[in-house]
Amino acid sequence: MAVSPMRASVYYVTVAGLGGEPDYEQRFTATAKDLDKVFKASSGAHVYTLTGNQATRARLTETMTAVAREAKAEDDLVLTLIGHGSFDGVEYKFNLVGPDVSAAELAAMCDKVPARRQLVVNTTSASGGSVAALERPGRGVIAATKTGTEKNATVFARYWVEALQDPTADVDKSESISAMEAFQYADRKTAGFYESQKRLATEHAVFEDTGHGEAVRAGAAQGREGALLSSLTVVRIGVSQAAMNDPAKRDLLAKKEELEQKIDALKYQKAAMDPGDYKKQLTEALLQLATVQGELEK
């Protein structure tokens, strides 16, 4: 369920790294530009996109420093890496124009951003090798490969962008697409790509959003894995997107997202709750949500 609390702003930083070959260069740049358009459609968003000769470690450092200076604790950060990565068994590096940047350096940049809720989407080859360095409480990490040894070029980024543009990715019909919904959509489409090509899959996407532990392929039905990604809205669509652009409806949208967050929390707490109390709280929240949704649609 896509249920983030109301935020003053979202900071989207997208980087298309070094392609090495013209076809990769074109693909990475096009993917980054597609994301740029999607993110700029969000009201209250701050969008930074680095491609071509701008995709350097120095420029990325400058951008993240600016975000760290401007962002507040209640804001969200979404960092997306597109391109090639490498892993030598110890250290992951994201390939950029000029010096590469390591996962540890990327984590240090993100650590300086005060936004309490962060998402890093690493769509590169060998990206699984970056998870351990990037993970921390309050930060969800998605990687296109399950380990640093899956080193072939990936297609996950293509379907991640598609997920943020396809209303069918909004599985719970909340008119917002969560990081978990986008992950599941892109993972499914990636698997379908290899099946259609009759090729052995060389990438298996994973995520980690508890702040510690191993990356996983799927969240627990009732547990911590997947809770943050499910609650973190990447983009809004439909009525929710329109409401963000309508000052008169922003308070209603805030209430809607607050109720959705409560419902999501109840789902993860169900196993530890009295069944009667769970049913009562869930019913009340669902009725309130229906009322608010009706007001938004007027």
Which residues make up each language-model segment?
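Cysteine endopeptidase catalytic domains of the caspase/legumain-like
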Residues: 4-298
